[in-house]
């Protein structure tokens, strides 16, 4: 090999290490798991190849991530009572997005990273408009990703919100239904739509 080829491979390896760092940053840390009274929330992702791949998880602790107090005050100032009421409900809810981009390559991790940022930004706007996450967000994500990714790139996702009483509401976009541990029955149970 020539010196130029060696330098090119070193730059490529450096870029891959850099991408690994970015992908690692997007993975939730234990401190990111929201706290909901009366519930134990946990999740685990095991990427096929190190940290890079198409599997993705994003927790949504509405209060910590989106400053509900400021949003509620703004909604009340604008006399948007329904938005204010919806925002107050989020204090007792947590959200989780699980997505799976097709494949286990660096490009699939890139699609997952794009989805991560688009999702969190979309939630930000949804809270301003409606005071909660609605199906509009997922319609928009689907449309945008369909128009901007290659034909052979796709993802499935499921978004759920769990409240203090243990009630789970979820939306699935081609993703298998969730499984939850039911203390009453002492086992994991699949939830049907």
Label the predicted regions.
Residues 5-193:
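… and, occasionally, acidic/histidine-rich disordered N-termini of signaling adaptors
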């Amino acid at each position: 090999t020539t010196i130029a080829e060696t330098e090119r491979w070193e730059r490529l390896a450096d870029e891959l290490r850099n991408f690994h760092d970015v992908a690692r940053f997007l993975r939730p840390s234990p401190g990111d798991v929201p706290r909901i009274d009366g519930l134990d929330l946990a999740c685990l992702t095991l990427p096929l190849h190190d940290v890079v791949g198409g599997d993705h998880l994003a927790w949504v602790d509405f209060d910590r991530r989106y400053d509900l107090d400021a949003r509620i005050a703004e909604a009340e100032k604008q006399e948007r009572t329904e938005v204010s009421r919806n925002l107050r409900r989020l204090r007792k809810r947590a959200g989780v997005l699980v997505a799976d981009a097709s494949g286990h390559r660096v490009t699939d991790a890139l699609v997952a990273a794009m989805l991560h940022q688009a999702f969190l930004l979309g939630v930000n706007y949804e809270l301003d408009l409606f005071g909660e996450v609605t199906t509009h967000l997922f319609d928009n994500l689907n449309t945008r990703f369909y128009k901007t990714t290659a034909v052979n790139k796709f993802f499935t996702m499921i978004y759920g919100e769990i409240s203090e009483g243990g009630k789970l509401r979820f939306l699935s976009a081609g993703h298998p239904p969730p499984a939850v541990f039911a203390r009453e029955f002492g086992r994991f149970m699949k939830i049907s739509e």
